[in-house]
Amino acid sequence: MEWTLERIKRAGFIAILRGKDPTELVQRGVDLAAAGAPFIEVTLDSTDASWVFQMLRGQLDDDVLMGVGTVMHAESALPSAAEWGAQFALSPVQPEGMVDLAHDLGVLAVPGAATANELWDAHLSGAMLVKLYPAVTSWSPEMLAGIPDPMRQVNTLPTGGITADNVEQWLDAGAFACGLGSSLTIQDTDLLSSRMLERRGVLR
């Protein structure tokens, strides 16, 4: 899991797939990966999410890491996701037992937080990365930059309203990485991959 976490930090972003047309989702995942997306998340509220995930896993190179999102019930979602090959699991909330179960399965747990208290609670539960959601309505780069010093040790993944145009504002404010969904285009992915590579060179 530490290796997955480090890969996420280096990548700077996770591409999120959500939709009602499984075939289109698979093609979008293939296209995003080809454009340089190193992480693909399939949300569990997507139609035939299991099929989409496994089709993509069979088509993508091993260096593209895959995970699931919108985990609402840990016990019913995580064992199956681990069997599919999920290496990380995101939730907009903090399902009971999510962190412990995911980590027992070798899956990086990323529970959600809409407030500073929830962020700290997720950290205390053992989460190595916490999803800030919804980022643009419950958080802002200024809020993230202004959190109390003890909370700065918490790795954060702002998601919800993040775009290629504002992702670096969040990273500059202290975000570990960001999640991008329907706003992410193939061109954005190519540009983001290059920009994240440049950032690693500058920040190294």
Predicted regions located by residue number:
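Conserved beta-strand positions in the central sheet of alpha/beta enzyme cores
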Residues: 41, 67, 90, 110, ...
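Conserved N-terminal beta1-alpha1 strand-loop-helix module at the mouth
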Residues: 1-87, 104-105, 153-156, 164-165, ...
